[in-house]
């Protein structure tokens, strides 16, 4: 029911940009889970890894098939910061990371197939809508824990 609601709402939206804020990653990649973390479930807890990977692939394929080019996801339940693009669907994802540097994972590896940015520290994300009504731009900034911008990406309406 939730999935159908989300898909219908995204398709019916006439917004210049669609942003899904999720508690876990949909793109990832999320390879460090499983052996690094020792808690029930083994850490396979997202749509970007084996936990819910089949649902993640299904949703990313749906995004691609529906040509939702002005759609991004933002998540915060990874312990590193990143901007990734799914190589098959083109879905863009941003992760704010842990709220402190001390809670960051130090073993994540840059994956050029997905990552456009990877930082093994904490911080937060800000999003701004800039430009004009005729030429809007969504700017996503990833900040360190002190507020300094460490990465910036613009999403243009297509």
Features from the language model and the residues they span:
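Long, structured stretches of catalytic cores involved in phosphate-ester chemistry, encompassing
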Residues: 1-158
